[in-house]
Amino acid sequence: MRWREPLDAVRVVRRSLRDAWDALVAIAPINLAWAGLGLTLVLLPPATAALFESMHELASGRSPGIRDYIGSVRRRLVDGWAWALWGAAGLTIVGVNVRLDPDPTDPREWVSAAVAVLGILFGVSLLYVWPFLFLQPDRGLVPAIRNSILATLAAPLFAIVLAVLLALVVAVGAVLIAPLVLVVPGLICLVASHAVTDRLRAWGRIPPRFSEEASD
């Protein structure tokens, strides 16, 4: 039921926080590697894609390793940049159409507000892309993007609450610098993986392979 979506989003974030805490020793070096590679800018998209992959491993019940992470960075160079360009294009369109100086008397403000909401949903769909790709790796990036959009539109309230909770996590991490570097980037990826599997489970569409892994 749609009214349960906010509670489901809270449950997903709570589970992700617990998993991240339990695996802190394993994910802290990976987050530091992501931060270091991201400084080059050129490697930021594939490093981010690889971070999603490592956190998907954690969400599947396996312990991610730094060596596997570095290997994933190499594999995700092209897909990582394709995803980054897709995200940059969408967020640019949103940014151009959202007014930063709202005027309540201007009827166009409703359009601007609607675009802002669509921008939030688009941002969440970007987080969903990689979990969908890892669940069905043989289908490629484009179907994963399509599925991420459909999943976001199918549960918009879940996505918006998830975005608000992630914003709070980032805000807390910004105050506590060490957690921001050591935990928050990977935590966001972990939340995305748990969110996708939570929605698929709610719709009865968990891939058989993932169901077997989750039960191990």
Give, region by region, the residue ranges found by the protein language model.
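Faces of alpha-helical transmembrane segments in polytopic inner-membrane proteins
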Residues: 121-125
